[in-house]
Structure formats: C-alpha cells, structure tokens
Amino acid sequence: MVTTTAENEVLTSTSAVTGLPQKRYYRQRAHSNPIADHCFDYPARPEDVDWRSLYPSIRADQEVSFADIGCGYGGFLVTLGELFPEKISIGMEIRVKVSDYVLDRITALRQKSSGTGAYQNIACLRTNAMKYLPNYFRKGQLEKMFFLYPDPHFKRAKHKWRIINQALLSEYAYVLRKGGLVYTMTDVEDLHNWIVTHMDEHPLYERLDEEEANTDPITPKLYQSSEEGAKVVRNKGDHFLAIFRRL
C-alpha cells in the first residue's frame, strides 16, 4: 500500500525500522454496523474454505482451533500465534482497512522470521462473524473463542447489535467443542454485566470461577496484548474479565 501526499511525496506504509506496517495508513472508524449489508465473499459450507490460501504451511490434519472475533489490529492474534505455535488461530474482522492491516502485518512477520516457521499459524479473514460463522467452522471445531473489547453499542436501540446475545450464543455453542472456552474482556462495566447475564442464562455455558480464570495461562495476555487493551492500560481504565466453558 502506498500513500501520496499533496506534495506528491510517496510514503510507504511499512516502517523502515521495524519492517512492519504502520497503522496510520490504515485508519478507519472505530466500529462498523454489523447489520448493514456489507459485501462479503463467504463459503457455502466449512468444507469449501480454502484454508491453504491463508496458511500456506498448514498440514492436512490441521484445522483452525482458536478464533479471535473482532480481532482489530491483530495484537492479540499475534500473541496467540506465539503462545501456541502448534495451534491454528484465525482473526475475524469486519472493517476492511483494519483487516488489510492485519494481513499485511502477518505477511511482514512471516518474512522477518523466514526459515523459522513462525507466524505461519495465524491469519485474518474479513467477514461478519455475526452472520457467517457456521459457514467457516464445522460443529464442535473450535477450542477457544475470544471477544475482546467488543463494540458496546451504548444506545438501548442498538443493544441487538451486540455480539453477545442469546441467538448468537447458540451459534457459538455450535462451532465450539464441549469443554471449549469463551473469553470475554471489556472496559465497559454495563457491557460486562450484559455478557455475564446472557451467558449465565444460556444452558450451554458455565462461568469459570475466579481462581480457574486467573490461573489460565492466557488470562494475563488478555489485558494488554491487543491494541484496545493496551490503550485501556495507558488510560488507567478498568478491565472486566469473564471466561465461560461450553457444556
């Protein structure tokens, strides 16, 4: 990607220091309307997904195990790839420029670590997870799902757009294996209470107690691995964590 200034000065989107794409060339609105009729290419069924186009080194016996829903700029997705090199993780993001950034970031990381095999286990899809999740994953495929700092949709009329609701929780339960985990983190207490209430009311989930949640090796990474989480830490904001097990 290349940007031309008013003085016809050409600026590449890649940092000469880090070799990674720079977010300022991929700016977009903080949120996107998930109900709007965006144009997406999506498979008719999970068997039709060409995973090798996203993971060139994937083995025939491997499949996506972790899904970061609304992955943003990919900070936590990259962390997942480093923490679990044997697992295949996917980030799903609805915003086009943001997903472009994540794809370019992964490409740059793979090039920087060429020969090591690092970051071959992560990828990003631009899609609407609120509509097309079962088109990508078969029943009981996923081990872990992450919903980190989702759009709170503060207005009551827009609560139906929240990514955690009763109808969608049933879809998540469909693609999540028994014993699988759903990780949620937000800096908005009202949204946290909404999430806990809806998941507690759903018969296919139970919340992990505080001790079990805090001893999960992923938990410390939830706070500031993502760009949103890091911003909350910088601003000395609150974090509200809840982890649920698929029954």
Swiss-Prot record:
Gene3D superfamilies according to UniProt: Vaccinia Virus protein VP39 (3.40.50.150)
GO molecular function, one term: tRNA (guanine(46)-N7)-methyltransferase activity
Residues spanning the membrane: none
Domain of life, source organism: Eukaryota
Catalytic-site annotation from UniProt: 151
The protein's annotated pathway: tRNA modification; N(7)-methylguanine-tRNA biosynthesis
Entry binding sites for S-adenosyl-L-methionine: 70, 93-94, 128-129, 148, 226-228
Keywords noted in UniProt: Methyltransferase, Nucleus, RNA-binding, S-adenosyl-L-methionine, Transferase, tRNA processing, tRNA-binding
HAMAP family: tRNA_methyltr_TrmB_euk
Entry-linked PANTHER family: 3-DEOXY-D-MANNO-OCTULOSONIC-ACID TRANSFERASE/TRNA GUANINE-N 7 - -METHYLTRANSFERASE (PTHR23417), TRNA (GUANINE-N(7)-)-METHYLTRANSFERASE (PTHR23417:SF16)
Functional description taken from the UniProt entry: Catalyzes the formation of N(7)-methylguanine at position 46 (m7G46) in tRNA.
Protein name: tRNA (guanine-N(7)-)-methyltransferase
Lineage: Eukaryota, Metazoa, Ecdysozoa, Arthropoda, Hexapoda
